[in-house]
Amino acid sequence: MFDALAERLEQAWTKLRGQDKISESNVQEALKEVRRALLEADVNLGVVKEFIAQVQEKAVGTQVISGIRPDQQFIKVVYDELVQVMGETHVPLAQAAKAPTVILMAGLQGAGKTTATAKLALHLRKEGRSTLLVATDVYRPAAIDQLITLGKQIDVPVFELGSDANPVEIARQGVEKARQEGIDTVIVDTAGRLQIDTEMMEELAQVKEAIAPHEVLLVVDSMIGQEAASLTRSFHERIGITGAILTKLDGDSRGGAALSIRRVSGQPIKFVGLGEKVEALQPFHPERMASRILGMGDVLTLVEKAQEEIDLADVEKMQEKILAAKFDFTDFLKQMRLLKNMGSLAGFIKLIPGLGGKINDEQLRQGERQLKRVEAMINSMTPQERRDPDLLSNSPSRRHRIAKGCGQTEAEIRQIIQQFQQMRTMMQQMSQGGFPGMGGMGMPGFGGGMPGFGGGAPAPQPGFRGYGPPKKQKKGSKKKKGFGL
């Protein structure tokens, strides 16, 4: 997402490089590139015109700070305006003073509404809120079955009355059921249409009137481009939305919908979908999204994703093994699977400042393939070989057997083992506080040190940043999650 937009904006900054100040004349070329970039990203034309006018006014009237180049100052102006357009700050879901909180989901067919409903339920369950899903889509074949299947997958109950019942009555009874059972939140999945029509809007209005929702969330497919603006406007004028969920941002969408929805409706984007898995839903933070658009990464989201997967106790054990030079292939496999659990390699890389626009899709695909090869190699080892990598260094017959087991050459196996040994040694030295100034090393496939990725430097693991070992937890203290820094 936003790759083409980020590349285009990079061209805009070059128009101001070498200038000693921002003026009415020299900013025009940069603004043309920004305008072209936004239009190619499918941002609504009216939003683009307003955006450019605001940037021009602020850029020309801004005093360039001593030591800051004009192109850097211009980037700051564009960043601030992007944040402003997308809503300034994250807007959390409403929560009723008296349970249940009722959330009505709306949107066109194919936008991913039912999946987004389940994703939202899982997000709330992780926050400790009990949730009930209500299936009112009685028109689409298997829509109710789909929601029931997703509900079982995330361990959230689903209320339904079959495909012959009235959607308004299903919604009303579902909310009442939640009230009787003391459930915190009800999420009502409604029927979609291939296009907006009077019948659809009338039914939505009746459901809304019957259940008086605290949130009306419009699910928007980010791949519909400029139509996102008119779609949002139509739903807001007829139903009155309180926010939006933008889906499929991990695909080939240009991302322009993210810049149009708030400005057109005045209502915030509250979540974005970044994959098909039910875990692939993130709260929308305008300042973080602006940072991604400008190729500056998103460290906070990276940290949050890691905190969900990393346990402090595991970090301490791993650090102790590294200090004792006992880091083995079993540990390495755990680290690889941790990376997988955090999402795709492409999504992970693009959250890292400075890397998002530097690594092309082919390199990312190569990195993904190599991760699979290394995992296959480790899976072909015996438990003893995983625990003692030196066995493989000294035994050609073991390497031959592993190569046959994972479909790779003996030379490839030998190279991966050598790189692993180098990585293990350097990780031990780095965890003891050595190797200053080695930032940027260790990215899989890009000159870094994960075995099989074309380099001997170590891949920095969460918690191993050249600091001393973390302090031991006191007995009885609550287990914490995080990097262990």
Curated annotation (Swiss-Prot):
Subcellular location: Cytoplasm
Cited SMART domains: AAA (SM00382), SRP54 (SM00962), SRP54_N (SM00963)
Molecular function GO terms recorded: 7S RNA binding; ATP hydrolysis activity; GTP binding; GTPase activity
E.C. number: 3.6.5.4
GO BP term, example: SRP-dependent cotranslational protein targeting to membrane
Keywords: Cytoplasm, GTP-binding, Hydrolase, Nucleotide-binding, Ribonucleoprotein, RNA-binding, Signal recognition particle
InterPro entries given in the database record: AAA+_ATPase (IPR003593), P-loop_NTPase (IPR027417), Signal_recog_part_SRP54_M_sf (IPR036891), Signal_recog_particl_SRP54_hlx (IPR013822), Signal_recog_particle_SRP54_M (IPR004125), SRP (IPR004780), SRP54 (IPR022941), SRP54_GTPase_dom (IPR000897)
Region entry Disordered, spans: 452-485
SUPFAM superfamilies: P-loop containing nucleoside triphosphate hydrolases, Signal peptide-binding domain
Subunit structure: Part of the signal recognition particle protein translocation system, which is composed of SRP and FtsY.
Family of the protein in this entry: Belongs to the GTP-binding SRP family. SRP54 subfamily.
Protein name per UniProt: Signal recognition particle protein
Species of provenance: Synechococcus elongatus (strain ATCC 33912 / PCC 7942 / FACHB-805)
